[in-house]
Amino acid sequence: MTNLRKTHPLMKIINDSFIDLPMPSNISAWWNFGSLLGMCLIIQILTGLFLAMHYTSDTLTAFSSVAHICRDVNYGWLIRNIHANGASMFFMCLFLHVGRGIYYGSYLYKETWNIGVILLLTVMATAFVGYVLPWGQMSFWGATVITNLLSAIPYIGNTLVEWIWGGFSVDKATLTRFFAFHFILPFIILAMVVVHLLFLHETGSSNPTGLNPDSDKIPFHPYYTIKDILGLFLMIIILLLLAMFSPDLLGDPDNFTPANPLNTPPHIKPEWYFLFAYAILRSIPNKLGGVLALLMSILVLLIIPLLHTSTQRSMAFRPISQTLFWMLTANLIILTWIGGQPVEQPYIIIGQWASISYFTIIIILMPLAGMLENYMLKPKFP
């Protein structure tokens, strides 16, 4: 009798993707974040579904409905806290996943990389519209400030902003449509994840050395299933510790106050995972320039494959590129810190220097380092 796993049309796809998939034998824990992101997405969709059952997307009752979920719904507080902190885990895994891709040259699988960047943008959009839903002060003012950025677009800007608002300010129409977007986008993300995996399985995974791994492959199951489960358990433990012991650690205290259009919070800032981009936005005095820099801070990832000058794929054996990579990491941490600070000196100038160095490292220094390393590796015999 033939094995159903290998003959059934549907089981065969699952088998070729998660069971008999040939994998490089030497991929490290940095390759765990793909499966962790998949799990984050599933957790977010499930908790979000249960929250949507009790949430009302009306300006008068949205804030109260969230309070009702936490007080009156069975384990509603837990579902809400897992959903809110799950977003933080999602972005933490995303940043590490993208960082791994840059360090080990995974961006050379261009199709996988490009759909990954589009995925990152879609997840960011989903998180933004989701943050508006509790209808607290920071939800309202965050929505007002960020949607207002579109007014910087010449000629059509103001019309576009009012079209997105569904009126002349952020109001009931805005909240309702943001809820609709927040509900539909995760399913679009899910479809894009399938495409992301489809492109990845065309080429197979890269590995820490950057060398061709074809000569040494092992099956995904049981080796990497058990490894992924270990990573998953660790992530769930961290998520539950965060959600149960300090659920408001990463949130903004202003969001415990219901939205009030007549009262502006002293410091309008997004969640921690957007602070680096927010710092880049604020570091440019011109509105349109700031918006373009904000977009470029993410879209610059799309040109990274074109800027690869090294003869080696991975940074594992490239000390100069490694130094630049960790400088970039430190730079992003500085930008994240600056994004949460008020707009005053010395934060303004630090933010401006950090923004300049962010783009300089990626666009200029990394390609130059690759060329320098190529030159240093050439034999210099007379």
Swiss-Prot record:
Its keywords, alphabetically, are: Electron transport, Heme, Iron, Membrane, Metal-binding, Mitochondrion, Mitochondrion inner membrane, Respiratory chain, Transmembrane, Transmembrane helix, Transport, Ubiquinone
Q: Which GO terms describe its biological process?
A: mitochondrial electron transport, ubiquinol to cytochrome c
- Name the major location: mitochondrion
Q: Which Pfam families match?
A: Cytochrom_B_C (PF00032), Cytochrome_B (PF00033)
Record: residues binding a ubiquinone:
201
Q: List the cofactors.
A: heme b
Task: Establish whether keyword Cell cycle is in the entry.
Answer: no
GO MF terms held by the record: metal ion binding; ubiquinol-cytochrome-c reductase activity
The membrane topology term of the UniProt record is: Multi-pass membrane protein
Where do the TM regions start and end? Answer: 33-53, 77-98, 113-133, 178-198, 226-246, 288-308, 320-340, 347-367
For this protein, what does the record note about how its cofactor is bound? Binds 2 heme b groups non-covalently.
Q: Which compartment or compartments is the protein found in?
A: Mitochondrion inner membrane
**Positions that bind heme b b566:** 97, 196
The UniProt record gives the binding positions of heme b b562 as: 83, 182
**Keyword Heme listed:** yes
Q: State the GO CC annotations.
A: mitochondrial inner membrane; respiratory chain complex III
Q: Which SUPFAM superfamilies match?
A: a domain/subunit of cytochrome bc1 complex (Ubiquinol-cytochrome c reductase), Transmembrane di-heme cytochromes
Any remaining note in the record?
Heme 1 (or BL or b562) is low-potential and absorbs at about 562 nm, and heme 2 (or BH or b566) is high-potential and absorbs at about 566 nm.
PANTHER family the UniProt entry points to: CYTOCHROME B
Tell me, what does this protein do in biology?
Component of the ubiquinol-cytochrome c reductase complex (complex III or cytochrome b-c1 complex) that is part of the mitochondrial respiratory chain. The b-c1 complex mediates electron transfer from ubiquinol to cytochrome c. Contributes to the generation of a proton gradient across the mitochondrial membrane that is then used for ATP synthesis.
**Per the similarity annotation, which family is this?**
Belongs to the cytochrome b family.
Q: How does it assemble?
A: The cytochrome bc1 complex contains 11 subunits: 3 respiratory subunits (MT-CYB, CYC1 and UQCRFS1), 2 core proteins (UQCRC1 and UQCRC2) and 6 low-molecular weight proteins (UQCRH/QCR6, UQCRB/QCR7, UQCRQ/QCR8, UQCR10/QCR9, UQCR11/QCR10 and a cleavage product of UQCRFS1). This cytochrome bc1 complex then forms a dimer.
- Protein's recorded name: Cytochrome b
Native organism: Philander opossum (Gray four-eyed opossum)
The gene is MT-CYB
